[in-house]
């Protein structure tokens, strides 16, 4: 509110810096006597008042949180239940996740993937930022077992595997003597041999088209009776063992039987005919051996023009020579 009270300020008793002036009420006597030496001024008190603008008051402080006794009271049981639910949700969110990423989409086993192009289940494992191929298998179970062995070998017994560690006790003992590279190669060999119908042993494979060779041992004897050629100890022989045949030492080079006396063949004997009773078209018997034609060698001759050409020495002197045993 404005102060409209009138006041008389004295020039002697008033200070300029004074906020509240000294007011003297006007008396009737002073107002009548104009000869008063002390001059006075009539002023409003509002002119000398210093108006100070204050900041707005601060907001009230928030209410203090409820104490433990208040939370445990009968009227605030719902607060306790909500806090318990929050703790359960936090525990579910903070649950330990797998270190090796999510499971494969094509298989419910870890580290196993199905490839439609090959139609097989392939197993992979990550080691030092690289994906290591463990092999391709016919079933997802065998691929998962291969992944578990590799995970135990690479990361120890605390690795994330598909089955129980106790199932691999025998494999763990074998892994100790093998390096990582050797162990991976053994898994790949096992997968490749199983794909070809092989065995777990090295260089052993199952071939359906060769099973009959091992089931019937009498085939070798039957082949010998039918004069079939078979391989035995690196030598090729003709197994003709009949009762009426007296000469069993047949030579396969010419296919004819030798005499009773065994002799060593010479190079000229290989030019003998297969049948001595062969006749020619004119009715004349041919010799019992094949003729050998001797051809003179060729010789390079220089022509008069300076260009060389090839000619035959004595082309008319071709002769026929025969070997006579």
Curated annotation (Swiss-Prot):
Alphabetically ordered keywords of this record = Activator, DNA-binding, Ethylene signaling pathway, Nucleus, Transcription, Transcription regulation
* Region of interest: Disordered: 52-79
Q: What induces it?
A: Repressed by miR172 after photoperiod changement.
Comp. bias regions, Pro residues: 54-67
- Asked if the Swiss-Prot or TrEMBL record annotates the protein with the keyword Amino-acid biosynthesis, the reply is no
Q: Which SUPFAM superfamilies match?
A: DNA-binding domain
Q: Name one GO cellular component term.
A: nucleus
DNA-binding region, residue intervals: 108-164
Q: What is the additional note?
A: 'Schnarchzapfen' means 'snoring cone' in German.
| Name under which the protein is recorded | AP2-like ethylene-responsive transcription factor SNZ
């Amino acid at each position: 509110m404005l102060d409209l009270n009138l006041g008389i300020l004295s020039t002697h008793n008033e200070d300029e810096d004074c906020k509240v002036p000294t007011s003297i009420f006007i008396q009737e006597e002073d107002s009548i006597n104009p000869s008063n030496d002390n001059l006075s001024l009539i002023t409003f008190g509002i002119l000398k008042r210093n108006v100070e603008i204050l900041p707005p008051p601060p907001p009230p402080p928030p209410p203090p949180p409820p104490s433990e006794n208040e939370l445990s009271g009968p009227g605030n049981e719902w607060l306790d239940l909500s806090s318990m639910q929050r703790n359960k949700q936090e525990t579910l969110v903070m649950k330990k996740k797998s270190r090796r990423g999510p499971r494969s989409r094509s298989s419910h086993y870890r580290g196993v993937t199905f490839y439609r192009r090959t139609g097989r289940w392939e197993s992979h494992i990550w080691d030092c930022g690289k994906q290591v191929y463990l092999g391709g298998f016919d079933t997802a179970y065998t691929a998962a077992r291969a992944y578990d062995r590799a995970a135990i070998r690479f990361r120890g017994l605390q690795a994330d595997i598909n089955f129980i560690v106790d199932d691999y006790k025998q494999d763990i003992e074998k892994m100790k003597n093998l390096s990582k590279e050797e162990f991976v190669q053994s898994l790949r060999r096992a997968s490749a041999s199983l794909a070809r119908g092989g065995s777990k042993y090295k260089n052993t494979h199952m071939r359906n088209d060769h099973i009959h060779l091992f089931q019937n041992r009498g085939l070798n004897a039957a082949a010998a009776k039918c004069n079939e050629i078979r391989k035995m100890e690196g030598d090729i022989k003709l197994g003709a063992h009949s009762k009426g045949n007296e000469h069993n030492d047949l030579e396969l080079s010419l296919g004819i039987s030798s005499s009773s006396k065994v002799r060593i063949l010479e190079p000229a004997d290989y030019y003998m005919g297969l049948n001595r009773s062969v006749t020619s078209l004119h009715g004349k018997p041919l010799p019992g051996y094949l003729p050998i034609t001797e051809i003179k060698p060729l010789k390079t001759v220089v022509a008069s023009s300076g260009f060389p050409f090839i000619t035959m020495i004595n082309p008319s002197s071709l002769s026929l020579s025969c070997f006579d045993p």
